[in-house]
Amino acid sequence: MTGAVAPPAVLVAAGGALGAVLRWRVVAATPTTEYPAGTLVVNVVGSFVLAALTFAAADADTMLLFGTGACGAFTTFASFSVDVVALVDADRPVAAAGHALGNLLGAGLAVALAWLLVA
């Protein structure tokens, strides 16, 4: 841990607090509709940020704080899964499939964009 700013657990916890608050703000700011757009936004943006940090070869402390901590708490593939099941339960299979594909393809495209911009 030579040169570390803080113990790894502290960096991850601080980043996690930041990411959780940011996710709450983004989801709260997203217009309420029948489609869970806030989940899509945080997953795509978080995937881009994590990929950019990775491709930029961020140092270990930066990755713990912003990668593992902030991006880990900001993104929410658990809520994404719950959203898909809720859409299926509401007899909206097309919306469920769109949400699933939107999150997965959006995250993948965000990673590709980060690679193009940073690598």
Swiss-Prot record:
Activity regulation statement: Na(+) is not transported, but it plays an essential structural role and its presence is essential for fluoride channel function.
One GO-annotated biological process of the protein: cellular detoxification of fluoride
Keyword Zinc appears in the UniProt entry: no
Gene Ontology molecular function: fluoride channel activity; fluoride transmembrane transporter activity; metal ion binding
Subcellular localization(s) per the UniProt record: Cell membrane
Ligand binding (Na(+)): 72, 75
Alphabetical UniProt keywords: Cell membrane, Ion channel, Ion transport, Membrane, Metal-binding, Sodium, Transmembrane, Transmembrane helix, Transport
Pfam family, one: CRCB
Principal cellular location given in the protein's record: membrane
Membrane topology: Multi-pass membrane protein
Catalytic activity: fluoride(in) = fluoride(out)
Record's keyword annotation contains Transcription: no
GO cellular component, one term: plasma membrane
InterPro entries per the UniProt record, alphabetical: FluC (IPR003691)
TM region(s), chain numbering: 2-22, 37-57, 62-82, 99-119
PANTHER family: FLUORIDE EXPORT PROTEIN 1-RELATED
Family the entry assigns: Belongs to the fluoride channel Fluc/FEX (TC 1.A.43) family.
Function: Fluoride-specific ion channel. Important for reducing fluoride concentration in the cell, thus reducing its toxicity.
Name of the protein: Fluoride-specific ion channel FluC 1
Classification lineage: Archaea, Methanobacteriati, Methanobacteriota, Stenosarchaea group, Halobacteria
Gene (name only): fluC1
